[in-house]
Amino acid sequence: GKSKENMLLLKHLKGDVQGKELVIEDSIVNERWRQVLKENTDIENDLFNYQKNREISKVPFMPVDRLITNDEVDDILDTLTKVLPTGKFTSGSYLEQFEKVLSTYLHKRYVIATSSGTDAIMIGLLALGLNRGDEVIMPANSFSATENAVLALGGVPIYVDINPQTFCIDPNKIEEAITPYTKFILPVHLYGKHSEMKQIRQIANRFKLKVIEDACQGIGLTDLGKHADITTLSFNPYKNFGVCGKAGAIATDNEELAKTCIQFSYHGFEVNVKNKKVINFGFNSKMDNLQAAIGLERMKYLSLNNFKRLFLADRYITQLAELQNKGLIELPELSEDHVWHLFPIKVRTEDRTDIMTKLHEDFGVQTDVYYPILSHMQKTPLVQDKYSKLQLVHTEKAHSQVLHLPLYPSFTLEEQDRVVEGLFHVIKQEVRV
């Protein structure tokens, strides 16, 4: 159910791979996928119930009421009837079970479930030894939580340019940003695309830096965490896998790091010793037992939902290829190191606002620029003092062109057809083709 396996499965179901027997691993993340594959092989008809000529008038970008299915709601309600009478809402066996299941799925020795992805990054940085004034190399096009975790601890974000094709930090730009104060590299797997972690790890080793990866949009990536000291995740309901609230996790193979993360996540207390502090301070950042119980139910849908995202991305890329071939848009590459949290395209900067407006007004299609302001272009006193002269050429150009199309597991193919139809009409109109 990881990204590489899902790509192979997609090719198999499309008939592009012959003579290979595929086995779906018997694990909790594959539970719903295994049930579907027993009955269905036609993706469009059986997985999406495609009705080609069904009329669509409105296409929402990411409607919160459709990020959880009726089946998931039923499963969650069933498990809540077991948890609520116990009164164990904060600590309990579901939390321990959730961490074990996630550890197995990620192939990491230790997982510490937290109350958010932001807390996971903060705790990870502290466990790795961040001190006030330490520099942390990162991209500038992520959600503010990435930089806020660094700033809250007294660290100094050092923004580095991206690879404009992937939207992820460009490893070739990292070395020139390293100073005697640099202690960390913090890559972000933006939109679900895996950063170039092997090269980043090599740079970190050469300069004796720690690597903590923001994988809040990257659950399901093959080899996630392989080249990082600590991996951080978010289970916000908008993510590929979410609970019914806010939560996150830290993953590592290092026992001492895991122990320190546990201490920072719960008031600095010694592990399994009541109220005995062994570090100066800690946070109230443990994931709730109640959310863990919900997470165990929703985890059953993870592989199925990530496969749906992959299929929808593949379908967008295929159907919009004509616009790309004519140089009217730029599409992301379909690859096995992507879990398609978001689907970004690039359009001409001067046309973007008109395209978004006309898609909405003429076709009922909502699009978005998911992170509208880059980190080094915020108007805060800190940014104006420290980063006002910073120029990140590729980051800024890509940001001025990016446009996000609707994509989520409950997104229908009829809705996708409407998006494609609208894009062809509006973009050709904009450039007078």
Feature names for model-found ranges:
Residues 5-123, 127, 131, 400, ...:
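Conserved PLP-binding active-site segment in aminotransferase class I/II-type PLP enzymes
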Residues 26, 36, 40-49, 54, ...:
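PLP-dependent aminotransferase class I/II
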Residues 43, 126-215:
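PLP-dependent aminotransferase-like
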Residues 112, 137, 158, 211-212, ...:
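Structural detector of well-ordered beta-strand residues that form the stable sheet scaffold
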Residues 162-166, 217, 237-238, 372-374:
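Short, acidic/turn-prone active-site loops that include or flank metal/cofactor-
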Residues 210-212, 230, 402-404:
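Structural preference for beta-strand elements that scaffold enzyme active sites
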Residues 213-244, 272-277:
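Conserved active-site segment immediately N-terminal to the catalytic lysine
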Residues 233-234, 248-253, 296:
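Short beta-strand-to-turn element immediately C-terminal to the catalytic PLP-Schiff-base lysine
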